[in-house]
């Protein structure tokens, strides 16, 4: 195949971002080169998200927009991957609705991408290749990461929880853990390449190892990662509150490398709604867990996910969510208005909340959380933090940016030769979404 260029469009979560790094690695191992923009590419791949129907609609819009490029360049090859094709009806609808699409593949058969592209480019076939069941985890697939000091490492795939609002178990499959040694070897290689921080990825990292021989648990994996020389920081996401065990908390508390930050999605503060969501814990359990973690790790910061307007949510239920937010005092929160997700049990539930009520509630929640976030950031003024310098600030290229161990973004003046180093920064101003500081 003559040298061709590629362009990847990524929608969705960090798992998708990492999948796009894998797609890029596969393409470059085949001789493709990255294109700076989609209009100059020979191959465009859209890596899709299906967690919400609004995300799907964005993808459909984008595919439609690419029709013009295909008219201008009939040799352009367009493919769709990710979570959307894992829904069989949607995948077939894509091919019918968008005749300019050349191929579709799913999350489970990413390793088959070279064969799919050979069929498209060499045999000029139109390909729909989506495995509905999970295959074995394939190791050794090349990954093309952006240069930097932080890297994402997938430790497991899929989810067994089947929360009633969530499509993920249906499109990502059941939980499958990577072998511990494969994960450790990948991290050692990343350190050799100059990365100094890794974030471990999984839909529920606390379930890691339950499907493996010998059942090496998440705490054991963390303890072994801690021993890797040259690695400075470790983070992980996402943690399901029900599965966050005491041994993980103990490893975090005793670690020099695991950062004092937990993303602990609560989703709702009402026991009635938590039960309807099939979350597997109560409000009281969650608050006790937070208290237990803070007792062991006093400087820990918490972030969360919250859904507003779930079917059956009353004003009393919503007030319980607000009360929980006041009690926990999250550093930040990802807040979402509930929207029906076709294919999930919640979409069929009665007592759907009116849109105007959901809009009012989400604004009330955002105002409460923003007030807490700003207050916590203001409390940092005068404190000195160790910052891993990541690069130039995205909002002010004259400044550098990095993160505290508690995952707060800090912007400060400094020379570019500090990128990739640990520095001490005194916080001068706490703002809503970041901190300002000076080198000390």
UniProtKB/Swiss-Prot annotation:
Top EC class of this enzyme: transferase
Annotated compartments: Cytoplasm
Annotated Radical SAM core domain residues: 145-375
Alphabetical UniProt keywords: 4Fe-4S, Cytoplasm, Iron, Iron-sulfur, Metal-binding, S-adenosyl-L-methionine, Transferase, tRNA processing
Boundaries of every TRAM domain copy: 378-440
Cofactor annotation comment: Binds 2 [4Fe-4S] clusters. One cluster is coordinated with 3 cysteines and an exchangeable S-adenosyl-L-methionine.
Cofactor: [4Fe-4S] cluster
InterPro entries with a match to the protein in the record: Elp3/MiaA/NifB-like_rSAM, Methylthiotransferase, Methylthiotransferase_CS, Methylthiotransferase_N, Methylthiotransferase_N_sf, MiaB-like_bact, MiaB_methiolase, rSAM
One matching Pfam family: UPF0004
GO CC annotations on file: cytosol
Binding site for [4Fe-4S] cluster 1: 13, 49, 83
EC number(s) reported in the record: 2.8.4.3
CDD domains: Radical_SAM (cd01335)
Domain MTTase N-terminal: 4-122
GO molecular function: 4 iron, 4 sulfur cluster binding; metal ion binding; N6-isopentenyladenosine methylthiotransferase activity
Catalytic activity from the UniProt record: N(6)-dimethylallyladenosine(37) in tRNA + (sulfur carrier)-SH + AH2 + 2 S-adenosyl-L-methionine = 2-methylsulfanyl-N(6)-dimethylallyladenosine(37) in tRNA + (sulfur carrier)-H + 5'-deoxyadenosine + L-methionine + A + S-adenosyl-L-homocysteine + 2 H(+)
Binding site for [4Fe-4S] cluster 2: 159, 163, 166
Membership in a protein family: Belongs to the methylthiotransferase family. MiaB subfamily.
Subunit structure: Monomer.
Entry function: Catalyzes the methylthiolation of N6-(dimethylallyl)adenosine (i(6)A), leading to the formation of 2-methylthio-N6-(dimethylallyl)adenosine (ms(2)i(6)A) at position 37 in tRNAs that read codons beginning with uridine.
Protein name: tRNA-2-methylthio-N(6)-dimethylallyladenosine synthase
Organism, as annotated: Carboxydothermus hydrogenoformans (strain ATCC BAA-161 / DSM 6008 / Z-2901)
